[in-house]
Each structure stands twice: as C-alpha cells, then as structure tokens.
Amino acid sequence: MVNEYKRIVLLRGLECINKHYFSLFKSLLARDLNLERDNQEQYTTIQIANMMEEKFPADSGLGKLIAFCEEVPALRKRAEILKKERSEVTGETSLEKNGQEAGPATPTSTTSHMLASERGETSATQEETSTAQAGTSTAQARTSTAQAGTSTAQKRKIMREEETGVKKSKAAKEPDQPPCCEEPTARCQSPILHSSSSASSNIPSAKNQKSQPQNQNIPRGAVLHSEPLTVMVLTATDPFEYESPEHEVKNMLHATVATVSQYFHVKVFNINLKEKFTKKNFIIISNYFESKGILEINETSSVLEAAPDQMIEVPNSIIRNANASPKICDIQKGTSGAVFYGVFTLHKKTVNRKNTIYEIKDGSGSIEVVGSGKWHNINCKEGDKLHLFCFHLKTIDRQPKLVCGEHSFIKISKRGNVPKEPAKEEDHHHGPKQVMVLKVTEPFTYDLKEDKRMFHATVATETEFFRVKVFDTALKSKFIPRNIIAISDYFGCNGFLEIYRASCVSDVNVNPTMVISNTLRQRANATPKISYLFSQARGTFVSGEYLVNKKTERNKFIYYGIGDDTGKMEVVVYGRLTNVRCEPGSKLRLVCFELTSTEDGWQLRSVRHSYMQVINARK
C-alpha cells in the first residue's frame, strides 16, 4: 500500500503541479526533508518523492501534499483528486482485509475507478446500471456468474492479472494482432501504451484496446481505444480537403492535444468537431484509433466537453515539447516512412513540371520537401515559414527527403517586416518565452553601497528582439551568445524585460533550434543614428556604439561629445561611470542611457542601470 501512496504522490501530485508551486512545496518541507537551501531548486520530483517516502513511511507524505494543495486556491481541485485516490487505496485495502469479493461494478484498480468517478463512462458503471435496471442484486449476479462457469475467485484473479499487465502481454501474442511491417516496433506501438497504466487516470488501459480489421476507413495496424481520455487542445488547423484512396474528396483537420504526461498529434476526420478542437479547450475522447503514434478521430468516435472537475493541468514542459520542431539533422537520421511535423524556414523553392522542391533550413542543416498534387507550387517565397503536418521521410536518389502523403498539410506564415526597434512588453509575464541570446555585457555593480550587481543582454525570437536586464549574475552562464533559453516570470518595464531570479531561466534541451534571420540580427545589434534620436520622445532608452570627439569634466559630471555622419549629441555621466577612462578618439558602447533635452540641446544621460564600455581606446 505504501507503494500506492508513493505512486499517487509522484504521478498524481508532484508531476501535475507547475514549477512555482513545486518550489513553494519544497520550501515548506525543507526542514522536514533536510533540503539544502542553496540547492533547493535542484531537487527533482522523483528525489522529493523518495525523501517523502523515507520521512513519512505511513503514507509517503500524501497527507502533507493534500494539506498543501488545500491551502493553495489554484490547487484545490488537485487536492480533491489526491483525496479521491487515497480513499481508493484505503478502501481497496480494507476490502481485501475483510475478504470481500469485488463484484463487476466494483473495480479494484485505482486507475480504472478514477476513470469511472471522473468521467462516469467505464464499462464497470455501465454493467452496474444494466444490473440495476434489471433489478438483479449483487448476490444474484454472483449466482448467475457462477452458473455460467466463472467463479468469483476466477474473476478476482483475472482482475489482478489485468492490473499487473498480464493481459496486455497476452494480447500482444494473439494471432489476430495485425503486424506492423512499415515501421520499427517502437513506432508501431501507441504512445499511450508506452506509459504505465498507473501513470495517470487519463491513460487508457490495455483491456480496452482492440486491433481492427483492415477496411477503407481504418489504417492497417490501427488500435482502437474505447476508454475515455481527457486531453487539452494545444493547436488545430482549419479544415482542408484531401483525396481518399477511393478518389473521393473529403475534409479533415490536424490537431495537437496533451495529457498531464505526454502529447499527441491527431487527425480529425469529422470536421463537425472543429468547435471542440479549440486552443486550451478540455475534451474527453473515446472510441478513437491510434496508428503509428498518431491518434485518429472519425465519425464513430466520441468527443465530449470536459466538466470543470475533469479538467487537467498540463505541465509547461509538455506544451513546450509539443510546440517544438525537430532539428533537420535529426530528421535526416530518421527511419524511412517516419512521419514528421514542424515549422521550418523556406530557403529555396524549385518548381518542376510534376512537383515542387521546397528546401527548408535550420541551424543544423537543410532538407528537401517534395510537394505534389495540391502542394505543387503553392504560394510561398524564400524566408516564409512552412508549418508541415504529417510529412513522410523517404530516401530518393540516396538522399532523405520529406514527401507529402494523403493527409499532409502545409500552413504558410508569410515573412513580415523585420522590426527596427526592440519589442516592448509591460507588467508581469508568466511565459515561458523561448529566445536566442544575441549579445551580453559583463556583470557590473550598479549600486556601490549595497553591492548590487546585474548585466544587460539582447535576445530574440524568430520575429522580434528584446533588451533584457538580468539581476541575478549567476545566470551569466546561461546567457551565452547563440544559446537558446526559455524565460518565464519576467517583468516588462520601460522597454526592457527584467529577470530577477535564476529559476526564471531554463535551458531548452528538447530540439533547441531557432532560425534568426541576418536582417533581424543586424537590427538588434545596430546603433541608431543621431538624427534618428532627435525624432524620439524624451525618456526613450538608447543603446549603441558612438565615437567620442570631445570630453569635458565639470563638478561631479563628465560630458562626452559624440557624433556620426548625421549629427552630434552630448553624453552625460555621473557617479560610478565617471571612473571609466575614455578619451576623445575612443569608441564608447552605451547601454540603457536615457534620452533627454536641455536648453542647449539633446543629451544621453546615465541612469541607475546604465552600462558603459570603451571599445577601442585612442592610441
């Protein structure tokens, strides 16, 4: 039973709460678990679950976790789920101790009961309903079952076999299981089957999966999943036409959905379900098929809106992985016939008589996409983004290529105008935002009295760039040029993104590929012309590199005259920046200087977070 408690703590508790609440939970249990304060953020959910099992042997710390969730308004639904799971474990144990028989309407598996209680559509509840309608008591059901030749003890044994996976292994050996000859074994199996049935109440069990005979609507080797699965919709395309093998024109759409532990690509062949496949919508799907790791929903499938108490919490890491595109170098290493999805930059387009070759490119390499039929010579040009859905990897002329198939789809994002100014965001943002580091300063002390330190950085997405203030210098190791990171819980203020804690920045370990155009890089690193600064509003913060042609020291201030081919301006520094030695003829790098004006003209004035560096001193 202790193992059951730990399973609930880990898989239904710690893995389902976000990073902020997990950090809060660790902080509250730091003394009980003897967590080192400096390394508190480093402990993983598995490590914490192991410590809780050792510290609280009675229930593996489940009571502590429930109490914590009840005190946090956003986690109260999670507390109810945990209490329901706990009651199932204690109820099941007492049932076994009393030697009671579990009837067909009383499943002993915690997972299957959670499905029944949360969705109300398991076969067990249906049997209970039909038994009640027939007016048959439990004793009568047992008697009739015994008369049919199956004793209650045998039923109990079968249920135990199902819980331990025996039935799944038997099903794999049945002769009517269609072979998967087109893909390696790992790709033939459903992603759902790769997870333990105890991992989540949302994962269908093997007893409700059936191999289907081949026909015109069901792909060969498809597996039917009749048990309900609760998912959150992440993305969905508009419906589009495709030609079936029978040369009929039909409609479908692609979608991406996620559970608490994994994500799935979905083919939806019933376009009347489009309204349900809306971003961030929670739905319950059943009677769907799985083929080569992709879920398929047709007219016989059930798609229902989830009730408020059936909604799930999808971790940000799952969402990031679902939205990430594979590296092209990894695609090239894939198995022939493998299916790929992703967003890529069009590098070159070659139109042939029967097909079009779209060469896509990222930081790891390039590959050709072969488009024929409706994907022949589509309206796109170099620099556009191609969002590929369901493209097949094939070897043509000894080279791996992505080839369109029956259900392939391409969504085009036109290249927009490259911004000249850094993007501005205001207030608190939870994120995460995935960016590439372009440029970074050295850490410096901006408050000499309290020894406060920071550094500046420039980062970019594929469409815009940002100025960043980082107030935790331990993050310098992550802010390395060309490194791709995810930032969260940051603040937007005066044209800068402000990051205060190390926990707000994480490495992007899954498919860290981002294509930043040369034009965007140039704009992000460019120095604004002085004539352009004359047209800007007072209070604008300026960064750039300028040639110094004059220097004047007056009281506690230093005045530098700077200029370019469009005009001249004055830079005023005071305090700590007066210690930077710079003479006329040198070049100054200015970061975060405020544009202001006096009676004599425009000035760039140093402020609390300004940074100044001499690029090349006069010889």
Swiss-Prot record:
Domain of life of the source: Eukaryota
Gene: Ifi204
Domain HIN-200, chain residue ranges per copy: 213-413, 417-615
GO cellular component: cytoplasm; nuclear inclusion body; nuclear speck; nucleolus; nucleoplasm; nucleus
Biased composition (Polar residues): 207-218
Protein role: Interferon-stimulated protein that plays a role in several biological processes including cell differentiation, autophagy and innate immunity. Cooperates with CGAS to sense dsDNA and activates the STING-dependent type I IFN pathway. Mechanistically, gets acetylated upon bacterial infection and then translocates from nucleus into cytoplasm to recruit STING for activation of TBK1-dependent IRF3 nuclear translocation and IFN-beta release. Inhibits the transcription of ribosomal RNA. May inhibit DNA binding by UBTF. Inhibits cell growth via p53/TP53 and RB1-dependent and independent pathways.
UniProt source species: Mus musculus
Motif Nuclear localization signal in this chain: 150-157
Pfam families the record matches: HIN (PF02760), PYRIN (PF02758)
Residue ranges annotated for the Pyrin domain, each copy included: 1-88
Amino acid composition bias (Basic and acidic residues), ranges on this chain: 86-99, 159-176
Full protein name: Interferon-activable protein 204
GO terms under biological process: activation of innate immune response; cellular response to interferon-alpha; cellular response to interferon-beta; innate immune response; inner ear development; intrinsic apoptotic signaling pathway in response to DNA damage by p53 class mediator; positive regulation of osteoblast differentiation; regulation of transcription by RNA polymerase II
